[in-house]
């Protein structure tokens, strides 16, 4: 199992990705944008916990105006914790699909 406290500056976000054994994020500061494949952009705040199922395609990041920090927890499978995919477009980031 691995975990880290991660900070994103305003406008920063991950690429689309999956975790072979899932991921849990715990928001500790700011506001986090989260989107699962085919779902809307959701906004989560300090104290909120978000769980992603194994293989669930998603991204997360800060809002355009607010930095954020979250604790990310995931387990390794065959030495791997993440599979990176395509970048999140500006339209996806803004929730325009």
Spell out what each predicted region is:
Residues 59-97:
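Double-stranded beta-helix
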Residues 1-15:
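A short glycine-rich, His/Asp/Glu-containing loop-to-beta-strand
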Residues 14-16, 34-35, 52, 57-63:
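Short beta-strand His + acidic residue motifs that chelate non-heme Fe in jelly-roll/DSBH
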Residues 12, 20-21, 40, 56, ...:
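A generic "binding-loop/recognition-motif" signal
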Residues 38-55:
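Short acidic-glycine-tyrosine-enriched beta hairpin
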């Amino acid at each position: 199992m691995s975990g880290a406290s991660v900070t994103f500056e305003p406008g920063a976000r991950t690429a689309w990705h999956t975790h072979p054994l899932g991921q849990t994020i715990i928001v500790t500061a700011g506001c986090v944008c989260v989107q699962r494949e085919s779902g809307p952009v959701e906004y989560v705040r300090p104290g909120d916990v978000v769980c992603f199922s194994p293989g669930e395609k998603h991204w997360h990041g800060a809002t355009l105006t607010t930095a954020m920090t979250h604790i990310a927890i995931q387990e390794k499978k065959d030495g791997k914790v993440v599979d990176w995919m395509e970048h999140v477009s500006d339209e996806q980031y803004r929730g325009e699909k």
